[in-house]
């Protein structure tokens, strides 16, 4: 009984289709191998299984090279070389553009592979990198030379021209720095002044009073309360402070015919003499103004003859006490 001829049509069962492909694939690859060895030809075999697994075979020449030869053939030769077992089917390629695109991609990948495997191409890339490194080193050296202009080494100078050029460069740089500083100060002057200003705690009244205490020169006497200050300096300071008061009191006493109270200083080395005038009428007038709403006026309570009390000086009192002492001493001695 003979072998049943298999009908050539698509196998509907997926498992049977995969098994049939595995069996016939091995036989097809074996036939291609035998053909490439026996006939010494360039052969390329590409297959995709029903599960989209790729199977490749090539003889002594790579698949990329075989396809490159196919692309370089004229169009007529490629069309005439197509072989169809079914003679009723005319050669027709529906997706010719797609095939050409795939072949071009394969050619590009082939060129890349050749460049990688070719040592000459690698050496050319290394040479380009070396040239780039040299160029960057030159730029770095030029930048270092520019920086050395701002820190010149006088030992390296051999002529006066080099000194003059270096001096001019430094002066120009200094000018630019000063201009930049002035620009920044002009822009930030308002904020700088606001941060450095301090408010006056005492106010204008206290400042005027303190300035009145100081001499006319306006110098700040930092040694005012210094214990180590010399007596002459203290005397000069006190005279400068109380001289306006003495002048004012003496002028007012001369105008109003008032008596003065003089205090004599027996130790004149330490402190100078000073005098202060008091007016009895002015004193009572001020007291009367302060106590107007409290009771009757002082002038009504006092007699008319006591309205003006003569001033008694300290010198008169001292003389009177001395005279009394001189009269009492003989009396005590006689007893």
From Swiss-Prot:
Coiled-coil region: 124-151
Keywords: Coiled coil, DNA-binding, Nucleus, Transcription, Transcription regulation
Reported tissue expression: Expressed in pollen.
Protein name listed in UniProt: Agamous-like MADS-box protein AGL104
Cited function: Probable transcription factor that forms heterodimers with the MADS-box proteins AGL30 and AGL65 and is involved in the regulation of pollen maturation at the late stages of pollen development and pollen tube growth.
GO molecular function, one term: RNA polymerase II transcription regulatory region sequence-specific DNA binding
GO biological process: pollen development; pollen maturation; positive regulation of transcription by RNA polymerase II; regulation of pollen tube growth
Keyword DNA-binding recorded: yes
Effect of deleting the gene: No visible phenotype under normal growth conditions. Pollen grains from the double mutant agl66 and agl104 have severely reduced viability, delayed germination and aberrant pollen tube growth.
SUPFAM superfamilies given in the database record: SRF-like
An example Gene Ontology CC term for this record: nucleus
Region Disordered: start-end pairs: 302-335
Organism, as annotated: Arabidopsis thaliana (Mouse-ear cress)
Domain MADS-box: residue ranges: 1-61
InterPro entries from the UniProt entry: MADS-box/MEF2_TF (IPR050142), MEF2-like_N (IPR033896), TF_MADSbox (IPR002100), TF_MADSbox_sf (IPR036879)
């Amino acid at each position: 009984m003979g072998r049943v001829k298999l009908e050539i049509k698509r196998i509907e069962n997926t498992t049977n289709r995969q098994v049939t492909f595995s069996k016939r694939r091995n036989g097809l690859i074996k036939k291609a191998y035998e053909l490439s060895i026996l006939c010494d030809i360039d052969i390329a075999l590409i297959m995709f299984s029903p599960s989209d697994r790729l199977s490749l075979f090539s003889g002594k020449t790579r698949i990329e090279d075989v396809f490159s030869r196919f692309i370089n053939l004229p169009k007529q030769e490629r069309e005439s070389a197509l072989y169809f077992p079914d003679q009723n089917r005319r050669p027709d390629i529906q997706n010719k553009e797609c095939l050409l695109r795939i072949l071009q991609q394969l050619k590009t990948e082939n060129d890349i592979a050749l460049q990688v495997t070719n040592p000459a191409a690698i050496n050319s890339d290394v040479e380009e990198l070396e040239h780039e490194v040299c160029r960057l080193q030159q730029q770095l050296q030029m930048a270092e030379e520019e920086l050395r202009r701002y820190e010149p080494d006088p030992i390296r100078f051999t002529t006066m021209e080099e000194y003059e050029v270096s001096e001019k460069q430094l002066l120009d740089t200094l000018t630019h720095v000063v201009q930049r500083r002035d620009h920044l100060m002009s822009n930030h002057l308002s904020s700088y002044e606001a941060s450095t200003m301090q408010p006056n705690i005492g106010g204008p009244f206290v400042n005027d009073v303190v300035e009145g205490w100081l001499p006319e020169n306006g110098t700040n006497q930092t040694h005012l309360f210094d214990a180590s200050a010399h007596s002459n300096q203290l005397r000069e300071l006190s005279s400068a402070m109380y001289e306006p008061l003495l002048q004012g009191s003496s002028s007012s006493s001369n105008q109003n015919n008032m008596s003065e109270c003089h205090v004599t200083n027996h130790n004149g080395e330490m402190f100078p003499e000073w005098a202060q005038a008091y007016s009895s009428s002015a004193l009572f007038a001020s007291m009367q103004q302060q106590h107007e709403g409290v009771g009757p006026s002082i002038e009504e309570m006092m007699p008319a003859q006591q309205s003006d009390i003569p001033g008694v000086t300290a010198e008169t009192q001292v003389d009177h006490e001395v005279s009394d002492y001189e009269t009492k001493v003989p009396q005590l001695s006689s007893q």
